[in-house]
Design a protein with these regions (language model features):
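His/Asp/Glu-rich mid-to-C-terminal helical/loop segments that flank catalytic regions of hydrolases
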Residues: 247, 333, 472-519
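Short helix-loop-beta-strand segments that form the rim/entrance of peptidase-like active sites
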Residues: 330-360, 375, 383
Length: 519
């Protein structure tokens, strides 16, 4: 009898230990406002943003401007406070185009040993400014300067005014370093990083040696569609001009031989990159906070998509990312309803609809450097593709390479949270926010070989040491195709994810400031 009693008591005690904690209550007004988010509201926003009339919201197209106007109008109608004049944060960008005069000449004692125009052996890069570089040619190994990691290819090299010649990829010593993540190693191999280091050392030009230069039409389409056009932010390339190009291993052979003989070579690099200016806008609303309103939490989603391709097909981008934009608009309306009843989080919350994500997170990158309002950003929650079920039928498809095969039927309740290795406090807050919603929140993509953690608008925040997480339901066969349409959205799931994200944003804005974990 005693033994049986003890057993029952132990079972009861163990059950008491492992029983889940009750959901953390939110103030009644915000809890009620969040529960008022409806499928109808989300459907209305996506039906407009992903309509053929907006033609895929591609940057540089009228449909993109119409999306900006629609979103600002929704915020205005919901009485969301403006975080920028008329909700619009202007962002100046440019589209680089290749001119006809691009060339490179490398000389030994005044005699050209390499002379090339655009072709399979030589190609200027979109990272280039339009400045012509003339100066001594200096070989700088991989062109990576990382003295804090014990490696600097510029040691004892005066690169001021020179054209530097660099190997492709990253130095072996950094690739083998246990201190560096796979993401860090990829950074050191990128041409943007080599250009940054070349500019920091005063170089006038950078030529990177590659096995395969690339297709000129692929890099510089003669008649770019909305989908293929590239855009960039004004910045270092114009403040400190640097000519940038790639050259083939084959073409550089005479130069290698001369450098091995320690001959003094000179180079003339004319990238002939023409910057065509354009303006776009981030759309910004906000609610003021309470005791910590000098700090802001940003919840955002990108409004743009791929536009129209060369064949005239429209990429409506219902999941990517009208779904995330609709969620942020619904969250903005919910927080504004609560604020109207006097219920606000401690910190201000900015509701951001970013532009230019498909061209490299241009709007988010600009905002991190120029926040509106000008306050300290303590956290970011990003929503990108939150309206479907992850479905990866063929891991060998280039779009999915590095991901495991999975079927939509196995992911009906799944949402992925990325950024957890950088923002563990936000990841824990997500667990709390999910107690009420009961989604299956997976944290398994921060280290995938596709670098998914870098491929959306939270990444500029993480790059600046700001805790950020990325919510997504994952990839599927309609990703970046004309078949990503409104009819394929799971609106009931999107509604739950919107409520989950809203609760997470409240917890981030009302609790202790989340910490950033350096990798």
């Amino acid at each position: 009898m005693l033994a049986r009693y003890v057993t029952v008591l132990l079972v009861w005690l163990v059950g008491a230990v492992v029983a889940p904690a009750p959901p953390t209550p939110l103030p009644a007004a915000i809890d009620h406002a969040i529960q008022q988010v409806t499928v109808a509201e989300l459907r209305e926003h996506i039906s407009v943003l992903a309509s053929d009339r907006l033609a895929g919201r591609g940057l540089g197209h009228d449909g993109n401007k119409e999306a900006e106007t629609y979103i600002a109008g929704v915020l205005r109608e919901a009485k969301v406070i403006q975080a920028a004049p008329d909700y619009l944060q202007r962002v100046d960008v440019y589209s680089p185009r290749l001119g006809p005069a691009a060339r490179v000449s490398i000389s030994d004692a005044g005699k050209p040993i390499v002379e090339l125009r655009v072709g399979p052996e030589f190609l200027p890069q979109p990272e280039s400014s339009d400045a012509v570089a003339n100066g001594p040619l200096l070989f700088v190994q991989h062109g990576v300067s990382a003295p804090s990691l014990g490696h600097d290819d510029y040691t004892n090299i005066d690169a001021k005014g020179a054209v530097v010649l660099a190997l492709d990829g990253a130095p072996d010593v950094l690739l083998r370093s246990p201190q560096l993540s796979a993401d860090d190693k990829a950074d050191f191999a990128a041409i943007d990083r080599k250009a940054e280091d070349a500019r920091a050392h005063g170089a006038a030009g950078l030529i990177v040696i590659r096995n395969y230069v690339g297709d000129a039409e692929g890099t510089w389409p003669s008649r770019p569609s909305v989908r293929s056009a590239s855009f960039r932010l004004y910045g270092p390339m114009h403040d400190k001009p640097l000519a940038v190009a790639v050259i083939s291993e084959h073409a550089i052979k005479p130069v290698r031989a001369a450098l091995e003989q320690r001959r003094a070579l000179t180079a003339s690099l004319n990238p002939d990159v023409i910057a065509q200016p354009m303006a776009m806008s981030n759309i910004l609303g906000m609610v003021e906070g309470g005791s910590k309103t000098a700090e802001i939490v940003v919840v955002g989603a990108h409004l743009d998509h791929d536009g129209i391709d060369e064949a005239g097909r429209i990429y409506n981008g219902a999941d990517d990312n009208a779904s995330g934009a609709a969620a942020v608009l619904a969250i903005a309306a919910a927080f504004t309803r609560a604020a109207a009843q006097g219920v606000r989080p401690a910190r201000a919350v900015v509701f951001a609809l970013w532009n230019g994500e498909e061209k490299g997170s241009l709007g988010a990158e600009y905002y991190v450097a120029h926040p509106q309002p000008s306050r300290r950003i303590v956290a970011n929650v990003n929503l990108d593709m939150v309206g479907r079920d992850e479905d990866i039928p063929d891991p060998n498809d280039p779009r999915y390479r590095g991901f495991a095969k999975t079927h939509a039927s196995d992911n009906v309740n799944v949402v992925h949270l990325l950024g957890y290795t950088y923002a563990p406090d936000l990841a824990r807050a997500a667990d709390v926010a999910n107690q009420t919603i009961q989604l299956t929140v997976k944290q398994d993509y921060d280290r995938d070989s596709q670098n998914l953690v870098r491929r959306s608008d939270h990444w500029p925040f993480l790059q600046h040491g700001i805790p950020a997480v990325f919510l997504t339901t994952g990839l599927h066969p309609d990703y970046h195709t004309p078949d990503d349409d409104t009819g394929r959205i799971d609106f009931a799931k999107l509604e739950r994810i919107t409520e989950f994200a809203a609760r997470l944003v409240w917890l981030a804005a009302d609790g202790d400031a989340p910490r950033f974990r350096t990798q």
